[in-house]
Curated annotation (Swiss-Prot):
Component of the ubiquinol-cytochrome c reductase complex (complex III or cytochrome b-c1 complex) that is part of the mitochondrial respiratory chain. The b-c1 complex mediates electron transfer from ubiquinol to cytochrome c. Contributes to the generation of a proton gradient across the mitochondrial membrane that is then used for ATP synthesis. A ubiquinone binds at residue 201. This is Cytochrome b. One of its GO terms (biological process) is mitochondrial electron transport, ubiquinol to cytochrome c. The gene is MT-CYB. The cytochrome bc1 complex contains 11 subunits: 3 respiratory subunits (MT-CYB, CYC1 and UQCRFS1), 2 core proteins (UQCRC1 and UQCRC2) and 6 low-molecular weight proteins (UQCRH/QCR6, UQCRB/QCR7, UQCRQ/QCR8, UQCR10/QCR9, UQCR11/QCR10 and a cleavage product of UQCRFS1). This cytochrome bc1 complex then forms a dimer. GO terms for cellular component: mitochondrial inner membrane; respiratory chain complex III. PANTHER family: CYTOCHROME B. Heme b b566 binds at residues 97, 196. Heme 1 (or BL or b562) is low-potential and absorbs at about 562 nm, and heme 2 (or BH or b566) is high-potential and absorbs at about 566 nm. Heme b b562 binds at residues 83, 182. Binds 2 heme b groups non-covalently. It is a multi-pass membrane protein.
Length: 381
């Protein structure tokens, strides 16, 4: 068996990726989220496949087909809520994974990091299109509002929006193509994940100290396989608690009303995991400016390797940058809260201040703090 593991063309790849992979001996639980994300992706593809067997992408029957899944299909309610809340778990793990990368300087692996950003955009696009499929009020109006943002693009904007809609409004053509894209994107994401891992295994994993760990490596199996299994069990416990006790906790009640183009919901808002970006979008009075800020709120991650001014990779020994990092985390919570509030005083000004803080911490304060910390180290020596 050992020979086959190391000689068989397919087994050899698996062996080098998950069994005999040299891993740093000191990576903490923050390094568990990669495997949890893989688990989430598998769960979403499997539950999604079973949902697609019963779903119809037609404006007349989409809402009814989701109701039929929940009421008449064996364990349909479980599959549907696993899929809906699985998306929330996916984003929780994604945000923690990206946060880990920012804290420990993993963005210095530029190829891995950039593929990660592409993955983040792909997952966000998939989740957005998935939210449209049940064809409830928030599905319809969310699709209308978000796709309409593209009309802010000069000259080609309006044509582009009508091309995406497949008509002059969000209708049957839009729903059908969103279903098609929502089905195909997870497989594209899976391919990107393989590329992400390929680039990661070229350099090896980072570790909490940010120092080179070549002198102190341990095999991935059994040390990190058992650690990943523990993480997966904890995630399943959390997800099942959510699904079985509070399935609608993270959803919107408006989505239990069938889509009606003649009746606008009082507060149009996306799912919770987009609220921070939605708050940044709304905080700018200009339409094109808002759209650019929305895209930049994620794309700013690509600038992190260029904005890294410190001699140290990780934030573990950098108290000023650490403080700024946790202020940034708190700021993202504030943005998420603001994104779910109506556009009125005092939420408008809070959103604007939080948006300015978000960009200034990343673009200005963190690079300056890196330089200051380096100077402080020189003074002490």
């Amino acid at each position: 068996m050992t020979n086959m593991r190391k000689t068989h063309p397919l087994m050899k790849i698996i062996n080098h990726s998950f069994i005999d992979l040299p891993a740093p001996s000191n990576i903490s639980s923050w390094w568990n989220f990669g495997s949890l994300l893989g688990m989430c992706l598998m769960l979403q593809i499997i539950t999604g496949l079973f949902l697609a067997m019963h779903y119809t992408s037609d404006t007349m029957t989409a809402f009814s087909s989701v109701t039929h899944i929940c009421r008449d299909v064996n364990y349909g309610w479980l599959i549907r809520y696993l899929h809906a809340n699985g998306a929330s778990m996916f984003f929780i793990c994604l945000f923690l994974h990206v946060g880990r990368g920012m804290y420990y300087g993993s963005y210095m692996f530029m190829e891995t990091w950039n593929i990660g950003i592409i993955l983040l955009f792909a997952v966000m696009a998939t989740a957005f299109m998935g939210y449209v499929l049940p064809w409830g009020q928030m599905s319809f109006w969310g699709a209308t509002v978000i796709t309409n943002l593209l009309s802010a693009i000069p000259y080609i904007g309006t044509t582009l929006v009508e091309w995406i809609w497949g008509g002059f409004s969000v209708d049957k053509a839009t729903l059908t193509r969103f279903f098609a894209f929502h089905f195909i994107l997870p497989f594209i994401i899976t391919a990107l994940v393989i590329v992400h891992l390929l680039f990661l295994h070229e350099t090896g994993s980072n570790n909490p100290t940010g120092l080179n760990s070549d002198a102190d490596k341990i095999p991935f199996h059994p040390y990190y396989t058992i650690k990943d299994i523990l993480g997966i069990l904890l995630m399943i416990m959390f997800l099942m608690t959510l699904v079985l006790f509070f399935p609608d906790l993270l959803g919107d009640p408006d989505n239990y009303t069938p889509a009606n183009p003649l009746n606008t919901p009082p507060h149009i808002k996306p799912e919770w995991y987009f609220l921070f970006a939605y708050a940044i979008l709304r905080s700018i009075p200009n339409k094109l400016g808002g759209v650019l800020a929305l895209i930049l709120s994620i794309l700013i991650l690509a600038l992190l390797p260029l904005l890294h001014t410190s001699q140290q990779r990780s934030m573990i020994f950098r108290p000023i940058t650490q403080t700024l990092y946790w202020i940034l985390v708190a700021n993202l919570f504030i943005l998420t809260w603001i994104g779910g509030q109506p556009v009125e005083h005092p939420f408008i000004i809070i959103g604007q201040l939080a948006s300015i803080s978000y960009f200034s911490i990343i673009l200005i304060m963190m690079p300056i703090s890196g330089i200051i910390e380096d100077k402080m180290l020189k003074w002490n020596s």
